[in-house]
UniProtKB/Swiss-Prot annotation:
Role this protein plays: Specifically methylates the adenine in position 1618 of 23S rRNA.
Subcellular location: Cytoplasm
Catalyzed reactions: adenosine(1618) in 23S rRNA + S-adenosyl-L-methionine = N(6)-methyladenosine(1618) in 23S rRNA + S-adenosyl-L-homocysteine + H(+)
Organism: Escherichia fergusonii (strain ATCC 35469 / DSM 13698 / CCUG 18766 / IAM 14443 / JCM 21226 / LMG 7866 / NBRC 102419 / NCTC 12128 / CDC 0568-73)
GO cellular component: cytoplasm
Family: Belongs to the methyltransferase superfamily. METTL16/RlmF family.
Recorded name of the encoding gene: rlmF
Protein name: Ribosomal RNA large subunit methyltransferase F
UniProt keyword list: Cytoplasm, Methyltransferase, rRNA processing, S-adenosyl-L-methionine, Transferase
One record GO biological process: rRNA base methylation
Gene Ontology molecular function terms on file: 23S rRNA (adenine(1618)-N(6))-methyltransferase activity
Phylogenetic lineage: Bacteria, Pseudomonadati, Pseudomonadota, Gammaproteobacteria, Enterobacterales
Amino acid sequence: MSAQKPGLHPRNRHHSRYDLATLCQVNPELKQFLTLTPAGEQSVDFANPLAVKALNKALLAHFYAVANWDIPDGFLCPPVPGRADYIHHLADLLAEASGTIPARASILDIGVGANCIYPLIGVHEYGWRFTGSETSSQALSSAQAIISANPGLNRAIRLRRQKESGAIFNGIIHKNEQYDATLCNPPFHDSAAAARAGSERKRRNLGLNKDDALNFGGQQQELWCEGGEVTFIKKMIEESKGFAKQVMWFTSLVSRGENLPPLYRALTDVGAVKVVKKEMAQGQKQSRFIAWTFMNDEQRRRFVNRQR
């Protein structure tokens, strides 16, 4: 069980294949979802959303000390290794100002989701403090239930409802607050029809019928928005200018490389001082996030060393 997963960040805890025997001890309900691959190796039935949820429960308990985790049916069940990669690469970005990863960084997660995945990983790995924003009251309730069910998380993670339709930072970042970074996994598709087509494609690839519920399901606000991710991130870029002195790094995942040029143009238009692209790879899946700041090197050094 020592095969490497190519491309993961060096500090990612998921380089080796899953130790399913250990994970089944951590969460016994995972055992019923184990299958054999054509090569005769044990694996998890990734087409079954209950299996993926059981795997996530085991991973979060075993690696991140999250003993109690659950999400309502129909919400995204995120792949933990890929989410951890974003956190580790973000840590490297925050370290460039002072040479060390800040231990008390304050992070804003835009669209924290029912799963609360980024704060859970970031709190455990780096001791960061998180604010999570969310438009869905059901997702917010789920995330709060996870926080309340695990000792210590209430002190590290706070949640805020985004009540203003179409707003991202406005109404969430308060007047005197400062954040070392923001992160976001934006809605990917540009319509409900496109989101359904994407799910259909994945169903076919897994050889399932259309009635099967899947771990790549998700609520409307998780999967699509008008104009897709380019429009969403452009809106984020536009709003970020108003918080240029309160946030050191704004970041967002970008699912498709071809979406980068219009985003770079938007960043030039708002006067971003520095723009960084971080490439990531999880197995065959390529992804990346972009980061931008309105602070120069000296301003970022002072920001990191500010009184907290």
